[in-house]
A protein has these predicted regions:
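Nucleotidyltransferase catalytic core that binds NTPs
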Residues: 5-17, 22-241
Length: 241
């Protein structure tokens, strides 16, 4: 990947776009084994290469369903992009462990249902955040129904906004298809710890959601009095940028 901060006002918008295009072509050519010189400019250009781990390649080639830094079967799973991980995530982890008595495994999906696949750079940057005593796994399970099949008898730590998407019909072929996917939580004994989140400037918790009856008993809410943190990874990224 390439990093460069262009001096504001030094070039027209068109010149900046031409420069960026040339840089992208250079990186693409390099990844294919060809040479294409990066434009010479006054600003500093930093080029960094990330070499994929063999296990990452196996995951993307569907040779394995997941990889992990912990050989134990995960019991308490915290899915997310963690881009970046922040204090709110840590508090959720600690509360969930205290409530369940289980050890948390952070789950990062390389192929989310509603996001582009992660690049090798994004994978490395994300995994490098975790401490040595923290467990993580990288999976190919984009849907929660797929996670349920991959990790039966597990408890998932999720936000109310994520739970809303689990039973949002637009992510499925139709209503029947959605209910078939949701039924897998019963089939594989999956439970959820649901943390409240601010959605459209309003704090929403489990008690505000209409959860399908067939899995309602599998959802346990964490009250606002116990936890509330309105910060999001998206807001942190925007601030840093």
């Amino acid at each position: 990947y390439l990093e460069c901060y262009l001096d504001k006002g030094k070039r027209t918008r068109e010149e900046e776009e031409e420069l960026i295009t040339a840089c992208v072509i250079s990186l693409l050519a390099d990844s294919c084994g060809f040479e294409y010189a990066i434009p010479e400019i006054d600003e500093d250009i930093s080029i960094n290469k990330v070499t994929a781990e063999k296990s990452w390649v196996k995951l993307f080639n569907n040779k394995v369903g997941f990889i992990s830094n912990n050989k134990s079967n995960p019991e308490l799973i915290f899915p997310g992009s963690f881009n970046p991980i922040h204090e709110g995530h840590i508090k959720m982890k600690e509360l969930a462990e205290k409530k369940t008595g289980m050890h948390t495994t952070f789950e990062i999906c390389a192929n989310n249902a509603d996001k582009p696949p992660l690049t090798f750079y994004e994978i490395k940057r994300t995994l490098d955040q975790f401490q040595n005593d923290e467990s993580w796994m990288l999976t190919s399970a984009g849907r929660f129904s797929e996670k349920a099949e991959m990790f039966p008898n597990s408890v998932f730590i999720i936000g109310a906004d994520t739970l809303l998407r689990v039973f949002d019909e637009k992510f499925y072929k139709n209503y029947k298809d959605m209910m078939n996917h949701i039924q897998r939580f019963n089939d594989h004994n999956i439970n959820f710890l649901v943390f409240g989140r601010k959605i459209n400037k309003k704090f929403i918790s489990l008690k505000n959601l209409k959860v399908p009856e067939i899995i309602a008993d599998r959802c346990t809410g964490i009250d606002e009095e116990m936890f509330r943190d309105d910060i999001s990874s998206t807001e942190i990224r925007l601030t840093n940028n």
